[in-house]
Amino acid sequence: MSEELRFGMFVPVQFLPFPVAVEQCQFVETLGYDSLWLGDHFQNPVRVHDPMFEAWTLLAALAARTTRIRLGILVSSFIARNPALVAKQALTVEHISNGRLELGLGAGERATDHTMTGVEVWQPSERVARFREAVAIVDHMLRYEITTFEGRYYQVRDAVMRPPSLQQPRPPLTIGASGAATMKIAAQYADSWNTLDISMAEWRAGKQLPALDALEAAQGQHAKLDEYCVKVGRQPHAIRRSLLAGYRVEAPSDSIDAFYEYVERYRAIGFTEFIFYWLPDEYRSLVASRLRTFDQRMVERVATEALPTLR
């Protein structure tokens, strides 16, 4: 039997006044989406002088104001956070949400997240090494009551985690990764692997890919993850394949037909979770050259017309 499809919304409500952020998240929940995700940056990445709330604090508040939808950060980085603190934050949200946390982790790379928090910018090799240690710490702390870890970059000594996670053995772990080094970490630890429908190099260059090129790139990543899973002794099917959509020229937000076509093409190569951007209207035009996002009408149409058919 094929794996159940899941559909989420990436909604950067950190940009919005808190009461509006709550309303928007409750609206997504009411429509029946499976998950809702926040970003994690110190500064607003679209308009640098606009508001930007901290992700874990806001996620905890949203957890207390929703009841069904699963909640996560896509993805939380360790640039300004010790891994033990991330584990404790995750456990707290896990309990506030009554077991609805999706734990999303990534290596982080935005320069302003370093400079604005007084953390020197890491070289790529150090970033990956730090990420590997951090994931190992968080994974262990959320599984066990006591953790000791002696790494090159992070040390945890007799760290106590009580109460235990409501979800066992820990909240589901999503690792965002597109390069070989971080995908190998995903192969070892993740329950779900998330990637973009574009390569990181093309994203940094501000490109959007034609549909078939993007599909081919995702298929190549998918095959690589299978290979890395086998090397660490895991079954490839143990890791859900998750896609953050909107970087292609032909976007799923164009129409209901485009949405169906997008989902079917990526489902055919093994993706079973789809996360779509919904930005506030005043931001959509600012990112249009790099990112295709949903508007409210499309958020509603997909929920009422497409999701019941696809599930």
Model-derived features with residue positions:
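Active-site-adjacent structural elements that line small-molecule/cofactor binding pockets in enzymes
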Residues: 1-311
